[in-house]
Amino acid sequence: MGNLIQTIPGENYSRVDDRAFTHNGCIIDLGCVRWNWSEIFIGKKRVIGADPFENEVPDGTELFKGVVGSFDGLIKMTYQEDGSHISNGSDSGDWIPSISWKSFCSRFNITDISILKMNIEGAEFPLLHSMDSEDFSKIDQIIVSFHDWMNPSWKHLTDASMYLLNQHGFTVHNIGPYGWYMGRK
């Protein structure tokens, strides 16, 4: 096991195991708006981000301008500076491409992942539960913000997701406020 480092200096929720720099896999940043979480890896590792509202593609990165979720298709989303969300029937919003985890990995030819980071405003639950043992076997570390702190009725989803990660060989630890957890194999 390596040492814990912060990808954003001074932010405990950004802690990762520094073995990511020597692990053969890529960095996946779901919810990569402003690229601040993954910036430390740009130019050192292959970095692939996904975010429907990110417009910048820094040199050394790849971007899926949409949502990585549990299905291929379209979803309606409302943009908010501090956390966009899937629109309900009465909300205005934009139709955004959604791609399943398997389709995302196929599109970007992803076979080995050093870190999968997810800050996707509640969509982490269906995404994680759409993944199978083959998907989890590709991942060395998972960093996720479970959003039950915003919606306490999602606590059971967080518990089920933590159980799922444990079942797939991850030791999960709380790393900061706002529901941030790190899972390492």
Task: Locate each region found by the language model.
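Phosphate/nucleotide-binding beta-alpha loop and adjacent structural elements of enzyme active sites
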Residues: 1-185
